[in-house]
């Protein structure tokens, strides 16, 4: 990735990584003080993750699957959900940066390819003009040769 070669890019990436912890702490605080955010934004991803984790561990151990997985307690689910959302935030920024770099590279490559195509077209036109000049000169040479043969006779 191009951004790794520039110090400013490395500093920015490091800053984004450093933001994830305060962002997670903010989510935990919001989860404690705002029941709507806790109930509908932070806890559902944690409970879903817990369900997948327990079921996959039981599958790996080849144990019987329970019908219902007991939910996590509210503080544990809040902590896990906030950590997951803060990591998703950092991942989203990283994915956005990768997308930005790729789109910029794609645009640059597309522009270069267009310039190459334009140069090819110009060169083809020049070759066509030169070919027409060669044909015209060849006809004139043949006409001059024919005229010289007529003069010699």
Curated annotation (Swiss-Prot):
This is Putative OPA3-like protein CG43998. GO terms for biological process: regulation of lipid metabolic process. The keyword NADP does not apply. InterPro entries: OPA3-like (IPR010754). The keyword Coiled coil applies. Keywords: Coiled coil. One of its GO terms (cellular component) is mitochondrion. Belongs to the OPA3 family. Residues 101-153 form a coiled coil.
